[in-house]
């Protein structure tokens, strides 16, 4: 049951990774920001915006398969939040990724790649048994094709992003614990908003420099 649940939420995981996909690529020019010494370049930003656009296109084309009529609007709204087309919002996402990537006690890149590969392998293993898993596999295949990449390259490119995602979840869990919050379907959006406000406060304490471009 645990594994089935993990697979059913895989699309959400992929959205997170697509929003963080290119933070590992480095360049020495056209900086848009630095986060605790980590550079974010214009090249990264443009590639990120391209990735966001492709992923939104793929997800939107499968929206009837992955969301009930009642949840279509919510799903598309979250997709816009995770894969922004707006330049400033995309920079903010990359800044958050760099911040989380620099946290202590992170999992290793090897472990990140192993976990991503396991989730993709799970899609193959269960796509014949569950329709939602089959759709997720189709989404990933289409995503790879439109970005002209392979599954193997995606795993490597996404390792840093996955590490950042894991660290973000750790911070979220600690926030809930420290605030003694009980999260359910009735207050989940409210709690997420509270966490985002808390995260903004933490980012203000970081060494972040933005460059005009």
Name what the model sees in each region.
Residues 28-158:
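N-terminal targeting/tethering segments
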Residues 15-19, 94, 166-170:
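Alpha-helical transmembrane segments
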Residues 115, 140-164, 169-213:
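Acidic/polar surface patches and capping/hinge elements
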Residues 1-81, 186-213:
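Short, low-structural-confidence N-terminal segments
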């Amino acid at each position: 049951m645990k594994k089935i649940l993990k697979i059913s939420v895989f699309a959400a995981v992929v959205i997170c990774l697509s929003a963080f996909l290119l933070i590992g690529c480095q360049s020495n020019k056209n900086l848009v920001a630095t986060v605790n010494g980590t550079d974010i370049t214009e090249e990264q930003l443009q590639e990120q915006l391209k990735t966001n656009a492709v992923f939104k296109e793929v997800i939107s084309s499968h929206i009837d398969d992955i969301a009930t009529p009642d949840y279509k609007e919510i799903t598309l709204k979250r997709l816009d939040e995770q894969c922004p087309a707006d330049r400033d919002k995309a920079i903010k996402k990359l800044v958050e990724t760099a911040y989380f990537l620099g946290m202590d006690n992170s999992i290793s890149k090897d472990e990140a790649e192993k976990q991503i590969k396991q989730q993709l392998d799970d899609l193959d293993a269960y796509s014949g048994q569950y329709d939602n898993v089959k759709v997720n596999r189709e989404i990933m295949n289409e995503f790879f094709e439109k970005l002209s990449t392979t599954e193997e390259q995606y795993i490597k490119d996404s390792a840093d992003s996955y590490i950042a995602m894991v660290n973000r979840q750790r911070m979220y869990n600690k926030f809930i614990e420290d605030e003694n919050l009980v999260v359910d379907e009735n207050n989940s959006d409210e709690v997420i908003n509270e966490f985002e406000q808390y995260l903004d406060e933490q980012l203000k304490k970081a060494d972040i420099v933005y460059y005009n471009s």
